[in-house]
Structures are given as C-alpha cells and as structure tokens.
Swiss-Prot record:
One GO biological process term: spinal cord association neuron differentiation
Protein's name according to its UniProt entry: Paired box protein Pax-7
Alphabetical keyword list: Acetylation, Chromosomal rearrangement, Developmental protein, Disease variant, DNA-binding, Homeobox, Myogenesis, Nucleus, Paired box, Proto-oncogene, Transcription, Transcription regulation
Upper taxonomic lineage: Eukaryota, Metazoa, Chordata, Craniata, Vertebrata
DNA-binding region residue numbers: 34-163, 217-276
Region annotated Disordered, chain positions: 167-224, 389-409
Organism of this sequence: Homo sapiens (Human)
Post-translational note: Acetylation at Lys-105 and Lys-139 by KAT8 is required for high-level transcription factor activity. Deacetylated by SIRT2.
C-alpha cells in the first residue's frame, strides 16, 4: 500500500524474531525516537530512554504466568537487569511506569501549614511573587529567620506550580480539544491525528496491568539424598557440562527439577576448580625443597629420628663422676649437605668409629640408590656436588686421627684449652658461642668450653647428631685450612700477595 503524498512513513519496530549480527560493536537501527542500538540478545534499545510500554506489559504478564526472569530476558531480548528492575518496581509500587529521567527528586522543605498559607496568599493575590510570599510569611510570624529553610523561595515556587499549574494545563487541554473538533475529519491532519491517538491510547503509561505477582520468597536450601548425590556424581564424572537432555534425564531419575540439577552442576564445577587449584599448588610445593605443604597433609618435624635406630654408647670413667656432654643445636640449612657428607665419610674412618663405639647411619638412610622419599628433607635439599660425594665416598680424603680426636678430661675441661695446630689459622674467623644459651649452644670441645654443660652423671654419652656435627666441623676446618695453604703457596709463586697476610682483601 503506497503512502499518501506528503506524508512521512512511520518506521515499524523490528520484530523480536529477527536475527541481528552479534559483533563486538552494537548495531545502530533507525527508530522514531532516534538512533537505536542492538544489544547482545538481539533486542533493540535506545540508550538513555525507558523501555517501551508494551514490552513492560509483556514482562509483567509472563512473570504472572510463572516464567522465570532469565527466560523472559531471552525470549523478549531484554537485558536481565532491566527485567528484574521492572518486576521489582511492580511488586513494590504496582506500577510499570519508568522513573524520572535525570535529575534528583525535589526536597520537601515546606511544612503542610506553610503550604496552606501559601495557597491562601495566592488566592488572595494571584499576581503575588514567591519572594513576596516569603516576606509575608516572615511578617505574619509563620516563620522566623532561624527556622526559614534555605530553599523556601524554590519551595514556594514548586507549591505554586503543583497547586495552580494543574488548572492551567487543564484549561489548555480543553482549548486544544475544542480546536481539534473544529478540524475536518477527512483532512490529512485529522486522519493522522486519529492514528496517533489510537497509538497513544494503546501505549498509555497510565494503563497498569493490574496482575497479581507472587511475592518473591527466599527459597530454602535443597537437601540431597545419598542416592541423588550418587547419580549426580556419576553424571559429573562423564561430563562437567551436561546438555538439556542429560539434565532432564537426571531430573527424572533423581526426582528433582531441571533447574536444581543445573544449579548443582554449577556448584560442583566451582568446587572441582577449587580442588584442582589446591592440588596444583601442592604439586608445585613438592618440587621445592622448602615449599610449604598443603594444610591437609601430615608433616614430620625435620631431623627428628627415633632413638632405637641410632643408639648411643656410654663410655665409663674410672676416676670420677663428671660428664661433659655437648648440647648440639638442630642442624641448620647450611649444615644439611655437610651432615650427609660427614656420614658418608664415616666409612673411611672406621678406626675412629671403632675407637669410640659410635653407631653409623642405617643403610636405608645412607644408600644413594634407595628410593627418595619426598618427606626426607635431607635428600631433597642436597646439591649435585653433595650427591656425588654420597655416591663416591672415596672422593673424600681420609683425615688423620689427630684432627678428630676428642679426649674427655676428668674433672672438667680447662678453660684455657688451646686450639689444635691444624686449626690455628681458622681461630680468628670462629666466634665463640657466649651469646647462646648454655643448654642449646653447640661448640666442639677442641674450640671452646662455653658450650658444654656439666651434669653429675656417671657416664660419657654422645648423641648421634652431636658426634656427626663434630666430625663435620673438624673436617671442614681441616679442608679449608689445606685449601688456604695451597692458595697462599700459589699466590707466593705468582707474586700476587705476601705469604704472611694469609688473605687478600
């Protein structure tokens, strides 16, 4: 049908069934109100303008029939937030009208008594200005300077607009209706006016749907039985994202709704992602020597070994009851590799072990070919050089017995015990353990006597770790002394530094 000459064809709204390209940028569509856009659901909207009235009616009708807001959003191609806001406002106020566009609501600063006086003054003198009404209120004593609101003039103007503006609008509407009746019905303006009136009547905002909606109540948590959980877990092992057919089949088998099944899978996927992240963190921590274990994993304190595996031997003293017992500290990280190296070198010093009757480590602890346990802090923290020493004990040269000999003295150790000749060059770099507590300080007897406690026990006992640490420290001092002597000889030959200095800075 061709349009009448001289008329502008009205743009029809696109039907909801049309498919719009879903790209990253919204598609612009021409609408009677201006440039519209297409949302991600394919629906047309105008930015900053309220949703059309017929769509608001449709939203309320669908909600009245029990359709969920998410389904309403997909079918009408309206955003979920818009649907929820319209339904919430309809439940609270019973109206589907949109709110005010921009601005803030005016403040009601004038009291009802003051408003009555304003109306009375306006009736007496219709040409009275707002500031004149304010002065009249102050003069008559209805308000004083301290109680006059700051926006009294604007409040008076608003009251005048509300009370007396309606009458003026009604008079203007009556005049327009009279002028419209005088126009011919067969004219172009009359035809378009009739069409416009019909469209306006169909989209009148004042026509409320008057449909009762169920008040949204908070749903109680669903409790699943063991049989239902078993069925759901089996389905979750097959797929984490079941389709609609799988969900409906599960709903029939478990006597649940399809929505409950969908929500259960969503929660189960979240729990699975959390568990997977925790497992990855635990696997990463196992790769690090000092990594923190997960919270649910039992841990053993490092260097806490049973006494039955490492027995101690008591050396009886004939002439006295005084015992000199070293109190070692727990080995630090710096000593981990050295403990294992010293224990490996104990095989080459069998004469020293037989002399003092000290028991060595078990084969399972010292065997390099034994399976590595992730809970063993010593084996995990070893460097490749230390592992090579463990695999080849003969690489460590045997030391003379004089470097390792510990001779307990009857009646206590002399405080002026001199350092052995092999350790004389190391004496300045070793600090005494005076600052440490006596019960926990560790010092070998060849260096100092401040780290020993005197107990009246008939017997001389060495802990396994104390003896191993003594061996390691003595061996370390001897090896470093030999290296420094060789370095001094090479430096003297090359003429780099005099031999007397001992160390270059």
């Amino acid at each position: 049908m061709a349009a009448l000459p001289g008329t502008v064809p009205r743009m029809m709204r696109p039907a909801p069934g049309q498919n719009y390209p879903r790209t990253g940028f919204p598609l612009e569509v021409s609408t009677p109100l201006g440039q519209g856009r297409v949302n991600q659901l394919g629906g047309v909207f105008i930015n900053g303008r309220p949703l059309p009235n017929h769509i608001r009616h449709k939203i309320v009708e669908m909600a009245h029939h029990g359709i969920r807001p998410c389904v309403i959003s997909r079918q009408l191609r309206v955003s979920h937030g818009c649907v929820s806001k319209i339904l919430c406002r309809y439940q609270e106020t019973g109206s589907i009208r949109p709110g005010a566009i921009g601005g803030s609501k005016p403040r009601q600063v004038a009291t009802p008594d003051v408003e009555k006086k304003i109306e009375e003054y306006k009736r007496e003198n219709p040409g009275m200005f707002s500031w004149e009404i304010r002065d009249r209120l102050l003069k008559d004593g209805h308000c004083d300077r301290s109680t006059v609101p700051s926006g009294l003039v604007s409040s008076i103007s608003r009251v005048l607009r509300i009370k007396f503006g309606k009458k003026e609008e009604e008079d203007e509407a009556d005049k327009k209706e009279d002028d419209g009746e005088k126009k011919a019905k067969h004219s172009i303006d009359g035809i378009l006016g009739d069409k416009g009136n019909r469209l306006d009547e169909g989209s009148d905002v004042e026509s409320e749907p008057d449909l009762p909606l169920k008040r949204k109540q908070r749903r109680s948590r669903t409790t699943f039985t063991a049989e239902q959980l078993e069925e759901l877990e089996k389905a979750f092992e097959r797929t984490h994202y079941p389709d609609i057919y799988t969900r409906e089949e599960l709903a029939q088998r478990t006597k649940l709704t399809e929505a409950r099944v969908q929500v259960w899978f969503s929660n189960r996927r979240a729990r699975w992602r959390k568990q997977a992240g925790a497992n990855q963190l635990a696997a990463f921590n196992h790769l690090l020597p000092g990594g923190f274990p997960p919270t649910g994993m039992p841990t053993l304190p490092p260097y806490q070994l049973p006494d039955s595996t490492y027995p101690t031997t008591t050396i009886s003293q004939d002439g006295g009851s005084t015992v000199h017992r070293p109190q070692p500290l727990p080995p630090s990280t710096m000593h981990q590799g050295g403990l294992a190296a010293a224990a490996a070198a104990a095989d080459t010093s069998s004469a020293y072990g037989a002399r003092h009757s000290f028991s060595s480590y078990s084969d399972s602890f010292m065997n390099p070919a034994a399976p590595s346990n992730h809970m063993n802090p010593v084996s995990n923290g070893l460097s490749p050089q230390v592992m090579s020493i463990l695999g080849n004990p003969s690489a460590v040269p045997p030391q003379p017995q004089a470097d390792f000999s510990i001779s307990p003295l009857h009646g206590g150790l002399d405080s002026a015990t001199s350092i052995s000749a092999s350790c004389s060059q190391r004496a300045d770099s070793i600090k005494p353990g005076d600052s440490l507590p006596t019960s926990q300080a560790y010092c070998p007897p060849t260096y100092s006597t401040t780290g020993y406690s005197v107990d009246p026990v008939a017997g001389y006992q060495y802990g396994q770790y104390g003896q191993t640490a003594v061996d390691y420290l003595a061996k370390n001092v001897s090896l470093s002394t030999q290296r420094r002597m060789k370095l001094g000889e090479h430096s003297a030959v090359l003429g780099l530094l005099p031999v007397e200095t001992g160390q270059a800075y």
